[in-house]
From Swiss-Prot:
PANTHER family: MOLYBDENUM TRANSPORT SYSTEM PERMEASE PROTEIN MODB (PTHR30183:SF3). InterPro entries: MetI-like, MetI-like_sf, Mo/W_ABC_Transporter_Permease. Part of the ABC transporter complex WtpABC involved in molybdate/tungstate import. Probably responsible for the translocation of the substrate across the membrane. PROSITE patterns: ABC_TM1. This is Molybdate/tungstate transport system permease protein WtpB. It is found in: Cell membrane. Keywords: Cell membrane, Membrane, Molybdenum, Transmembrane, Transmembrane helix, Transport. It comes from the Archaea. The chain crosses the membrane at residues 10-30, 57-77, 92-112, 116-136, 165-185, 224-244. GO terms for biological process: transmembrane transport. The gene is wtpB.
Amino acid sequence: MMGRDYALYFFAALGSFLVVYIVLPIVTIFAKQALDFEMLVKTVHDPLVLEALRNSLLTATATALISLFFGVPLGYILARKDFRGKNFVQAIIDVPVVIPHSVVGIMLLVTFSNAILDSYKGIIAAMLFVSAPFAINSARDGFLAVDEKLEHVARTLGASRIRTFFSISLPMALPSIASGGIMAWARSMSEVGAILIVAYYPKTAQILVMEYFNNYGLRASRPISVMLMLISLSIFVFLRWLIGRVRE
């Protein structure tokens, strides 16, 4: 028993390295910005910054909704049907995870050219490519967790497949689907590389941070980073808390 306890302490010590590694930069940037509050106030009143934040929030939200609209049906098919090429389809879904995001931007630009160049469509297209796997995989996992016998009973009692989907499958898988939507939104909010190539304009907050850093240095880019983190983390934590309450 004692050996197992020591092993747990050892694993906790090893794992805590990553926790500290993640938390330390977050705490540090907030602490240093608090010492330069005047710059933060100036940035909060910068119309360009506010517009960039609005662009990021709107496009990320639109991307998450589009990911769910197309990803939920695909997730249901992957969870419920075996078909030739299914493993290939699942592999394709995960491809965006391994492609460098600057390459994603080049691919989209080569494919769609001026149709998405420097536009909201381009921003959403870039975000969608990198975030869709989260929505699809979460939906698939959610439907896999639903007992298929419940669907069969409903079908036996005369319910159509579409009615069974909306009355049984979808409500029971909803927490997982919502989690996927949140992750798709968060991934969209953090995207830079693909957007940089496809749609430098209209500027998102992610691009503006990079631009301010290149042109004006760390002090100018830090408050925008803090604002973007505050907004993103607040929304992310709230949505995760909401999903947790629904699961309870």
